[in-house]
């Protein structure tokens, strides 16, 4: 490759061939080459325009090319992109304060992806546990959960599909049915250092537990001096109509993990703890080269300040209710096809009878992007800025898909 060749335009066929040739085959991709995004719209390199109701897997919280986010990242790139966490930066200090305020926590650790955040949370919980007793290392998580594909998060993830071929998994992990307090109670003892849950299961099918379930989990953790970890990688950052989903129930975790939407599309993640857990880790116990770098912190600061200044938390709650009601109209129209509509804010799931993939493909053919999870749940996690007019476009595409599939 000669200098400058990377900037030459490739056609669709070449792009796909080059990607398939060099990238490990770990993704199931659609034969589309995305080129440009603006707001809630994205264009492929053949000029086709799509309304995106998936937001890059709940990541693009401000949509595509939000001017505040673009300006913040561009200006920071022109000043300082990386210097390591051996030094202080102003933008990191600003981002830390914003995350602390949004999460309701006191201390923050920045990482690069949700799995890293969850790994760090479990690592802190293990150290907390064994400081109390050498056998206090058990971590309980839920069936149908998803916490990442790194080795320890894999053991905490409640899908057999992800476990096949990777045994023996990390020891000390126990799975229980989600929402079943008696099953959890049967596994709880003084050897449990943490319970790890999603306040709303995403990958498992957009399952919303009753508020009293989370309250009962909190009580069990308190009884056994176990830390309650909420994985808010997908549910956090205004996604559900609150800054973080735990705020719906009033059940505050001991550790909260975040990622996806917090950088508005820039890779950044981490976890947050109250002051009483701030010194479980000592210098050198945990860290990372890139976590909390200036570019990531600029993205975090711009994203959170924009969500706050534009009043998006309340707007998400309002638009989410409208969206859910429109989906319920489809359920009434197609009672044999739509089994359930559930979720909070702009994290919605429409469970269908039969496979969901044909519905996703039909929507794509009608220039709308949605996703299918758990085999038959159409997952809808659009940018937080989606308009009611764009919601109507998504619902119309789903209507066509349900009629045809």
Annotate each PLM feature:
Residues 4-405:
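Conserved N-terminal phosphate-binding loop of PLP-dependent enzymes in the Aspartate aminotransferase
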